[in-house]
């Protein structure tokens, strides 16, 4: 009796609400221009991976033959090299697990390229740590010898009559070894003429004085004034003297 009752009740029950909805096909397809996940999966599965693998093997074998013909050694791609203390993933043909400062790496590179060693402050040293013969016999940079009358004091002509010590010092102060500027005013030989300015510039040594002489020879004092005079410099013949004789080229 109970089974028959329940069977009749189930026959009169309405179907579930989900079954009443009509399936809509627009939800099953993705918008235009966008592929669904299944389509992407099918596309990846259809990709010809075997052909790509074969091409890679062909390139690798050709590269190995190139290294063998050039006398180089090929290494496994799983090795790593350390350059400057930082590890990098190494490609084919690099040194395994060595830094540029490692002597063993330097020895290997000398057998391959034999170039100069840049790890020792730019000196031309082989990877074996020995100086080449030409580097030992090579002379150093040539220096221009100073003239016999070179001194640590320069005598300067061509300064305007109204020049001040501060203005002249501003010209010579940028040079290495500069020490002092001394100005000596002399009365003009002509009545009413401008006074004559004798200028002496002291440096630490004759080499510093020669550098300033070479750089400032013919220096135009006033670039705006077209009639401005040009500096004329020479080594002072008597560096210890504080004043000169009569005339612009007296005893110096």
From Swiss-Prot:
Q: Which Pfam families match?
A: RRM_1 (PF00076)
UniProt keyword annotation of Zinc present: no
Q: List the cysteine pairs that form cystine.
A: none
The protein's GO terms of the molecular function aspect are: mRNA binding
Q: Where is the composition biased (Gly residues)?
A: 242-252
On whether Phosphoprotein is a keyword of this UniProt record, the answer is no
Q: What does this protein do?
A: Probable RNA-binding protein.
Protein's name according to its UniProt entry: RNA-binding protein 2
Name the encoding gene, please. RBP2
């Amino acid at each position: 009796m109970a089974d028959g009752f329940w069977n009749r009740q189930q026959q009169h029950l309405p179907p579930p609400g989900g079954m009443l909805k009509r399936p809509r096909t627009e939800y099953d397809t993705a918008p235009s221009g966008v592929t669904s996940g299944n389509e992407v999966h099918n596309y990846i599965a259809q990709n010809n991976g075997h052909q790509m693998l074969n091409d890679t093997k062909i390139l690798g074998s050709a590269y190995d033959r190139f290294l063998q013909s050039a006398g180089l050694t090929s290494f496994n791609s799983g090795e790593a090299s350390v350059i400057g203390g930082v590890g990098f993933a190494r490609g084919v043909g690099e040194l395994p697990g060595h830094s540029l400062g490692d002597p063993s790496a330097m020895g290997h590179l000398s057998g391959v390229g034999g170039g100069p060693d840049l790890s020792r402050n730019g000196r031309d040293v082989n990877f074996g740590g020995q100086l080449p013969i030409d580097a030992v016999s090579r002379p150093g940079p040539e220096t221009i010898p100073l003239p016999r009358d070179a001194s640590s004091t320069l005598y300067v002509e061509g300064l305007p009559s109204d020049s001040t010590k501060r203005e002249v010092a501003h010209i010579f102060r940028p040079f290495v070894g500069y020490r002092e500027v001394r100005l000596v005013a002399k009365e003009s030989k002509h009545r009413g003429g401008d006074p004559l300015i004798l200028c002496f510039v002291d440096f630490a040594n004759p080499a510093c004085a020669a550098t300033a002489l070479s750089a400032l020879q013919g220096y135009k004092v006033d670039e705006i004034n077209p009639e401005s005079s040009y500096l004329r410099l020479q080594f002072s013949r008597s560096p210890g003297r504080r004043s000169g004789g009569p005339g612009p080229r007296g005893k110096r």
